[in-house]
């Protein structure tokens, strides 16, 4: 693979500008509601105004167009809470709009600081957001320019796939619980994960032990062989299990209840399998439309599902330098001090999906990278828990990847190990 090209995923830069010194034509705080949206506005001449907008895209776009005409397309800063994606989508269609996305906890704490009674109203909430822009803009970071549509599409596919996998896992656990209650021998009859097609076929044909024991051994044996089983000794062992098994549940009403439940859950699992397969095809296609897809695909342990997630994570981060990535993705620790007490903990408000992506990939990289395995084992030997060790490993990986993207070179395991030895890193002693 040749050296990676300079594209969005390889362009190592701070994706935000210095908006602290920007002269805005107006500052606007908007509180998103179900039926209407409240706003507070301060123009550059010092005047304030407030109002509400009916919940409709037409009303919102009409209002934004009036702001564009009123301020002559000069920059206008908007403060909105992070939980209002439709509002964000509308505002970002105007090139003069600069969006500061406020975490709900931030606005809540500022509101309660001045209203300890707990009173809450949309107009005051919009004013709180405006106050943050007026008094604390130096501590806020504007949203970076939107990433390319194909990256957003890929990110959506990755997230949808993960949701389906999580849902399928939940259904598999429900199936396992039901089988334990009336047909525990099933777990000895197939070693596959419960979402595998052979499990659905098996339980659709023999949903309980009674129907299975009534079947001829030759037919059961043919079922195994026709579904890819070639180990004759294993098949004979399972036939013997069937022959000697005793049903734990013989009440027809209870068996009917359990088999019906398992049937319906397996139907959902089969549908999820088909949907995941479709998403895998779409994900592969869109992933390969990105110029640097091979760079991510060849990272140790980054398979067909994790490599696209890593690409999206880096492309959608506000900054692609190592320190910015480590903070944004939540691998950089936070130190708190109160009096004589000092403690360190992980960052709580990192983007969950991206944080999860880095943790999962770090775990897989241990199986495919010599130095990553050594790093993980040394961390465990120092008493670190699994997730703390993986988070530290992800922290390390971000430095490596950021450097590769900065220099526009591919990751090379052997070259990196040589670098560790040259620097006399503690990792190099056992490599």
State where each predicted segment sits.
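A detector of single, family-specific signature residues
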Residues: 1-431
